[in-house]
Amino acid sequence: MAVPAQPSSPPPVCQFSDRLATALNAAQEATGTDSHHAHHHHTPSGASSAISHTHDNMPHDHGQFHDHGPGLWTPEEHGHTHEHLEHAGKFAERDMPDYTGRNWTERAFTVGIGGPVGSGKTALLLALCRGFREKYNIAAVTNDIFTREDQEFLIRNEALPAERIRAIETGGCPHAAIREDISANMGALEKLQAEFDTEMLFVESGGDNLAANYSRELADYIIYVIDVSGGDKIPRKGGPGITQSDLLIVNKIDLAPHVGASLDVMRRDAAAMRGTGPTLFTSVRNNDGVDAVMDIIVSAWRASQGNGKAKA
């Protein structure tokens, strides 16, 4: 089965600093190499996301440069796109989607699924595709760092026809592709929309840490998936994914007795961190709780079709 092509511009993870450029020029002069080394880099909000430069007038691209060489720069200087958070955030103060003037023919209602590696994001996406595909016109985009593993899993398990599942290889920090530079994911979603005129779109991020969360420009509804295998302390650790996602899912609850995790503790801590934010406890592999997730998504989708500012 043919694997669909993906957008060719993955998001950047780093920018060169002036200090690095100076060091490179000095090294070139010392070794007598050609001093022409014209760099062209972009900020996360830039129109282009490839890191490129030329040697001897021969252009080439560096997909993801993330080499913090010793002595070249400090974390404050190197132009990294990571956000520094003052606090975990509050559910009631999260960014809300604004549908005013939204053209749904360009991109349908988009559900973003995030969470740490191995929490069950892809299994959830598979279950949602199976549950929605007969009633709704849907498509999906997956994100991996260097592979198409999740796309291939979904195709192999016949979640949707292969042409409705696109893959992004981020080449670096997964959160950059869903927040700092969303161009690759946005492009894939818009192409799916143009081809299939979908009613709902799904995008799954690569596995990341608790600080990762979606940009509202990309995801109309944000689901964050954690699981019990990391211990019952995870909800109280906070982070935007836990505190500010529209829906928090605690997955693999069937494993709780085997890993010594207390669901009561996780339920208590999730409520303390999220306030009125909904939390569902699931065992996606056993199809436990999936219907409740689907019901919440459908309610959010229906509410969005009235346009205007979404309610917290």
Curated annotation (Swiss-Prot):
Gene3D superfamilies: P-loop containing nucleotide triphosphate hydrolases
Extent of motif switch domain 2: 171-172
Motif (GTP binding P-loop) on chain: 115-122
Signal peptide: none
UniProt-recorded Gene Ontology molecular function terms: GTP binding; GTPase activity; nickel cation binding
Stretches with biased composition (Basic and acidic residues): 53-86
Disruption phenotype: Fails to grow on agar media with urea as the sole nitrogen source. Leads to the inactivation of the URE1 urease and reduces the efficacy of brain invasion in mice.
Taxonomic superkingdom: Eukaryota
Sequence segments annotated as region (Disordered): 28-86
Sorted UniProt keywords: Chaperone, GTP-binding, Nickel insertion, Nucleotide-binding, Virulence
Residue numbers spanned by region Histine rich nickel-binding domain: 36-87
Disulfide-bonded cysteines: none
GO BP terms: urea catabolic process
InterPro entries from the UniProt entry: CobW/HypB/UreG_nucleotide-bd, P-loop_NTPase, UreG
NCBIfam families noted in UniProt: ureG
Protein family membership: Belongs to the SIMIBI class G3E GTPase family. UreG subfamily.
HAMAP family linked to this entry: UreG (MF_01389)
Assembly and interaction partners: URE4, URE6 and URE7 may form a complex that acts as a GTP-hydrolysis-dependent molecular chaperone, activating the urease apoprotein URE1.
Function, as annotated: Urease accessory protein that binds 2 nickel atoms likely via its conserved histidine-rich domain and supplies nickel for the functional urease URE1. Has probably a dual function as a nickel chaperone and GTPase. Plays a role in host brain invasion.
Written domain comment of the UniProt record: The histidine-rich N-terminal domain is involved in nickel-binding. The GTP binding P-loop probably binds GTP and the switch domains undergo a conformational change upon GTP-binding.
Protein name per UniProt: Urease accessory protein 7
Organism: Cryptococcus neoformans var. grubii serotype A (strain H99 / ATCC 208821 / CBS 10515 / FGSC 9487)
Gene name, Swiss-Prot/TrEMBL: URE7
